[in-house]
Amino acid sequence: MGGSRHFAVDDAAQRRRLEAGLDAIGLALTPAQVDTLFAYLTLLRKWNGVYNLTAIRHPDEMLTHHLLDSLTAVPALAEAARSANVAQGARGRVLDVGSGGGMPGMPLAISCPDVSVLMVDIVQKKTAFLTQCRAQLHLTNAAAHWGPVEKIDDEQGYAVITSRAFAELTDFVTLSGHLLAPGGKLIAMKGVYPQAEIDRMEAAGLMADWQVEAVPKLVVPELDVERHLVVLSRR
């Protein structure tokens, strides 16, 4: 396995960078929540050394490219989950499709205890990791599901369905759209402005039923990269 390489970790420095990143994003978390975020990052590092959960192995890059990158989307995801005009049973429910090691679902669940997050992945070792995190971090508002999202049947539906590295917009909408509650939002995390993906949605005929509401730009602390959210809703 590729986990044999060892990296020295300065936990105190990483925690300071995490706290600075949270300040830059505008996420006001309690010290206990910051502790839990850092504990999650530590678990990700440890499990990744054995189970290859992510190709990113350096602790500094795990902090920036995974945790801070995901945390930038948390305010928008939480606001959409709380304010979506959905039925009572779907309110505050978020589905994270292709969650992998838990991004962005785990940071969202830690940051927003009033939001219920289900993280889905087809790789069993990844959902096993997420289930372990839920237990060790005492996250009663988080859960993991192993299997393809298109096979899930949930009558309540979700206020928000999100993905970070799951698929093209066309596949994201096609495979997971049936789980979105009426009035809910699909929110995909993307890099550069995904005009080509939006065009392919149009070419596939999906714009007859779906619309792009907004494509806000995100700024990730410590990363000089382009990041956007694509917010979709049913017409």
Swiss-Prot record:
InterPro entries xrefs: rRNA_ssu_MeTfrase_G, SAM-dependent_MTases_sf
Its biological purpose: Specifically methylates the N7 position of guanine in position 527 of 16S rRNA.
Annotated residues for binding of S-adenosyl-L-methionine: G98, M103, V149, E150, R164
PANTHER family in the cross-refs: S-ADENOSYL-L-METHIONINE-DEPENDENT METHYLTRANSFERASES SUPERFAMILY PROTEIN (PTHR31760:SF0)
Domain of life: Bacteria
Organism of derivation: Cupriavidus metallidurans (strain ATCC 43123 / DSM 2839 / NBRC 102507 / CH34)
Keywords per UniProt: Cytoplasm, Methyltransferase, rRNA processing, S-adenosyl-L-methionine, Transferase
Catalytic activity: guanosine(527) in 16S rRNA + S-adenosyl-L-methionine = N(7)-methylguanosine(527) in 16S rRNA + S-adenosyl-L-homocysteine
HAMAP family: 16SrRNA_methyltr_G
Protein name: Ribosomal RNA small subunit methyltransferase G
The enzyme's E.C. designation: 2.1.1.170
One Pfam family named in its UniProt record: GidB
Localization per record: Cytoplasm
GO MF, any single term: rRNA (guanine-N7-)-methyltransferase activity
Gene3D superfamilies according to UniProt: Vaccinia Virus protein VP39
GO CC entries: cytosol
Family the UniProt entry places it in: Belongs to the methyltransferase superfamily. RNA methyltransferase RsmG family.
Predominant location category: cytoplasm
